[in-house]
Each structure stands twice: as C-alpha cells, then as structure tokens.
Amino acid sequence: MVLSQRQRDELNRAIADYLRSNGYEEAYSVFKKEAELDMNEELDKKYAGLLEKKWTSVIRLQKKVMELESKLNEAKEEFTSGGPLGQKRDPKEWIPRPPEKYALSGHRSPVTRVIFHPVFSVMVSASEDATIKVWDYETGDFERTLKGHTDSVQDISFDHSGKLLASCSADMTIKLWDFQGFECIRTMHGHDHNVSSVAIMPNGDHIVSAARDKTIKMWEVQTGYCVKTFTGHREWVRMVRPNQDGTLIASCSNDQTVRVWVVATKECKAELREHEHVVECISWAPESSYSSISEATGSETKKSGKPGPFLLSGSRDKTIKMWDVSTGMCLMTLVGHDNWVRGVLFHSGGKFILSCADDKTLRVWDYKNKRCMKTLNAHEHFVTSLDFHKTAPYVVTGSVDQTVKVWECR
C-alpha cells in the first residue's frame, strides 16, 4: 500500500514523537536526521501519542471486523440451512430465535428456576420472592401463584406425569405440591441450611435434594421421610440431578467438583475435578445424543458396547465441560461465556448444547465443532435458568431482571 507524501510525513512525525517520548534518544536523533524532520513545539503537540492512538484503534477495528465476519457467517448459514428461503430445517436442529415470543413479568425478585410441565402447555417459575408461578407458554397468560415457602424458592421439579411438583427453598424446607389441586401436600424438614436443589426421581417415589449443609438427601414421596444421606462434598452443594433410569445421581458444588453417586449403595462412583471455580449446574446427556457425542469426542465404545453415560457441567470459571462418567474423563471444554455459567442442557435433538449465564446471554453450541453457533442477548440482567421443551419447539429462560422469557425454536 502506497502512502501519500502527507501521510508519510504524518507517520514519520508520529514515530519521532513515540521514540522521543519513550526515551529512545539516539534512535530519535538518527531517525529525525534521516527522515529530514524539522520538529517544532506546535507540530509536536499535534503528534503527541498519535502512534499509540492509531495502534489501539486498529486493534479495536480488527476485533469489530472479526465480530462482524462471524455474524455474517452465521447469517449465511441461516440463509442456506434454515431461513424461509433455504431448505426447511429438521426439527432436531431447531434452535431458539430472537426476539422472544413472550416476556412475562409478575415476580417481585429475581427468578431462580424455570421448567416446563411434561404434559400440559404450562411452565413454572420459582423466585427469590418466595413464590412459584404458573404460566401458559403458548398464550403468555399468567395462571396462578403457589405460596407457602417463607424464603427464596431455589429449585422446582415435576414428576414424569406432571401431577406432582417438588420445590425447595432457603427456608430449609422441601415442599411437595399436588399440581392438579395446587395444594401443598407435604413439607419436609431435615437440611440444616439453604436447600439449593431438588429433583423427583424418575420412578416418582423418591425425591433428592441438595443443600448448603454440604449434603444430598433422598426422601420418600409417600411418607416424607428422609431415607438416605449422601456425604462427601466439602462445601455447599449447588445442584443435584438423577440420570434417566434413576440408578445414578450427579451433584455439583462450591468445592469445584462434580460427583456421581450410585443410588443403591450411596457410594461416590466418580469425582470429576477440572473446573477452577464453583460448579453451578449439571445436566445428563439424553441417550439420543450418545452417537453424536461419541463421534464428536472419539470416545471409544467400552467393552460393554454401550457408550456413556455423559454429563455436562457449567461453572463460575465461565466454561462448560462434558464428561464421560464411566472413565471420569473430561471430553471437552466449551469456552465463550463472559461470566458465570448458570444453566446448561442438551438440545432434545442431541446435536447441540444450550447454556445461559451471567453475561445475560443464551447460547447454542455445536459441540461437534466445539463452537458457539448462536448467541442471544436474552435478558437485561443475569440469566439464571433455562429449560428446553422435550417435544414442543420452545425454550424458556429466567433472570435476575425478574422476567421469564419464552423463545420459539425454528
């Protein structure tokens, strides 16, 4: 690229200013002589710091160009594969698209968890305002509020039929609700601190919970009795989730580990440690994703001939990790969020991962290529939770901005 005489003169003066102001006196005097510069104070002021300014603005522009290029590639991909003009996408590849279909407000404090009902077109949100709210995600209508907890509701879980809802709270209790009559039918006491997570086991007759008292407990639905306590985490247990058949449970903690427990014996089958900060969330891979995962990670099929099980974890270290539970190996780390990762799960088609974080975004990852393929600026504040409907094309998110948003996938 050829510079004009004026540009060359400006560049020379800026270089001379840089050499002089950074103490390269000898180089400055040689350069000044060779470039035939007559420096004077008036001119000097004009060129003070000019080289640094140009340099930083070039870097800034480069970054912007790269961002725009990646957005352009994303748009091209959409155009060829999923836009109204291209081929219709297979529902297995539908992903959430902005803008949101509904932004639902009603909670008076941050939303802590959002989940879909397994049968009806409703979803449920829990909040630090001590309430649970029920919404119709197809119409955006608010349906009702469940009241009973006296402090922040931290987590909620349906049984497979959707007739029972379990909730847990910073008030140290777990409540079981009849979701047909919307009545609280049982309250379970036993944890000594904030109960941060709850899940109804796949068979529907037990509930697992995790708390800041460092324990995981298992409760009988019928009686409300605590029948097992799993100990091993050294700090606050953030989340607990059973696998599909209920033989294993996974938990994650402030101690920066993910643990997998055998339900029958209470033994810790695996302790997964590679995160460098609190692990906020975990999610089991559905069997529909096993072949994609094996292909993406080259994890060889074991002697039993069955791959997996696989687990996802999201952490305050801003990363998402995928684990092979049988070997305890971390298969991949997804980097892209700019803040704590608060929710992570597999797309029901098995090819993608969805996550949400305190960087206010909802992201879709193509894990085969270890890249973030879509970023949605989802909320005005931290995104605390997300859920993906098993059969309908919807994603729901909850946030510290007190809203719940419904996103349509296509």
UniProtKB/Swiss-Prot annotation:
Residues 83-410 are annotated as: Interaction with dynein and dynactin. One of its GO terms (biological process) is nuclear migration. It is found in: Cytoplasm, Cytoskeleton; Cytoplasm, Cytoskeleton, Microtubule organizing center, Centrosome; Cytoplasm, Cytoskeleton, Spindle; Nucleus membrane. Residues 1-66 are annotated as: Interaction with NDE1. Keywords: Acetylation, Cell cycle, Cell division, Coiled coil, Cytoplasm, Cytoskeleton, Developmental protein, Differentiation, Lipid degradation, Lipid metabolism, Membrane, Microtubule, Mitosis, Neurogenesis, Nucleus, Phosphoprotein, Repeat, Transport, WD repeat. Residues 367-409 are annotated as: Interaction with DCX. Its main location: cytoplasm. Residues 1-102, 388-410 are annotated as: Interaction with NDEL1. Residues 7-39 form the LisH domain. Residues 56-82 form a coiled coil. Pfam families: LisH_PAC1, WD40. GO terms for molecular function: dynein complex binding; microtubule plus-end binding; protein heterodimerization activity. CDD domains: WD40 (cd00200). WD repeats lie at residues 106-147, 148-187, 190-229, 232-271, 274-333, 336-377, 378-410. GO terms for cellular component: 1-alkyl-2-acetylglycerophosphocholine esterase complex; axon cytoplasm; centrosome; cytoplasmic microtubule; kinetochore; microtubule associated complex; neuron projection; neuronal cell body. Can self-associate. Component of the cytosolic PAF-AH (I) heterotetrameric enzyme, which is composed of PAFAH1B1 (beta), PAFAH1B2 (alpha2) and PAFAH1B3 (alpha1) subunits. The catalytic activity of the enzyme resides in the alpha1 (PAFAH1B3) and alpha2 (PAFAH1B2) subunits, whereas the beta subunit (PAFAH1B1) has regulatory activity. Trimer formation is not essential for the catalytic activity. Belongs to the WD repeat LIS1/nudF family. HAMAP family: lis1. Regulatory subunit (beta subunit) of the cytosolic type I platelet-activating factor (PAF) acetylhydrolase (PAF-AH (I)), an enzyme that catalyzes the hydrolyze of the acetyl group at the sn-2 position of PAF and its analogs and participates in PAF inactivation. Regulates the PAF-AH (I) activity in a catalytic dimer composition-dependent manner. Positively regulates the activity of the minus-end directed microtubule motor protein dynein. May enhance dynein-mediated microtubule sliding by targeting dynein to the microtubule plus end. This is Platelet-activating factor acetylhydrolase IB subunit alpha. It comes from Sus scrofa. The lineage of its organism: Eukaryota, Metazoa, Chordata, Craniata, Vertebrata.
